[in-house]
């Protein structure tokens, strides 16, 4: 078993608002192409005469996940693209090689695609998921200091995948270990079982 969330990952997608716990598992991405890039939010500073800092506030960070899939004979791509645009919003779960470790969860993303070709790699599509705030998504929920529900664009979650009928997967999510607090399973409700 691993100590960190590295190695060959599994990527799962689901349209936002799906009625069933059915996720598609994507083909194995190109080696070392899967990554999440955070962009730190802008910092706003109020200064007084003489340059002293009165107050400082940092805006929320933004997140993008990207991976490359080979265009293979007989293997369909996960998204229909029109000049790099993918219609609809998708949930994204990236499970590390060791499923006991936390993986990436984005509860609402827009998806873009960049199609490319080289003689070294052949045909590839780079898919980029830009994370949005997933209002009402219990997997993305946390509670702030005011005891209010807050929905995060990016969360660490332990992801358990079970293969079901028709090549679909059912995913269960847990919070990761936090100090002495053990992982807690997150209960999702779907409108159709």
Functional labels for PLM-detected ranges:
Residues 1-71, 108-124:
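Solvent-exposed edge beta-strands and adjacent loop segments
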Residues 77-105:
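Short, acidic/charged, Gly/Pro-enriched secondary-structure junctions
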Residues 13-17, 94-100, 175:
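Short acidic, glycine-rich loop/turn motifs
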Residues 64-68, 91-93, 126-130:
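Beta-strand secondary-structure signal
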Residues 105-193:
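Mixed-charge, glycine-accented linear interaction segment located at domain edges/termini
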Residues 34, 98, 178-179:
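Generic N-terminal simple sequence motifs
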Residues 4-9, 85-90, 166:
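A short, compositionally biased
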Residues 69-73, 96-100, 131-135:
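Beta-strand elements of well-folded, non-transmembrane domains
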């Amino acid at each position: 078993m691993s100590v960190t969330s590295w190695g060959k990952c599994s990527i799962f997608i689901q349209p936002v608002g799906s009625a069933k716990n059915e996720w598609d598992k994507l083909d194995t991405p190109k080696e070392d192409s899967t990554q999440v890039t955070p962009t730190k939010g802008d910092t706003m500073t109020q200064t007084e005469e003489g340059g002293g800092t009165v107050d400082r506030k940092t805006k929320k960070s933004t997140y993008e996940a990207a991976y490359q899939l080979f265009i293979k004979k007989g293997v369909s791509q996960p998204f229909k693209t029109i000049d790099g645009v993918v219609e609809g919003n998708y949930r994204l779960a990236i499970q590390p090689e060791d499923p006991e470790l936390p993986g990436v969860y984005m509860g609402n993303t827009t998806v873009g695609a960049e199609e490319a070709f080289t003689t070294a790699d052949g045909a590839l599509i780079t898919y980029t998921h830009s994370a949005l705030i997933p209002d009402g998504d219990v997997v993305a929920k946390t509670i702030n200091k005011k005891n209010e529900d807050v929905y995060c664009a990016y969360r660490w979650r332990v992801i358990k995948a079970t293969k079901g009928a028709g090549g679909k997967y059912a995913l269960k999510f847990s919070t990761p270990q936090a100090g002495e607090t053990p992982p807690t399973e997150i209960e999702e409700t779907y409108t159709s079982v």
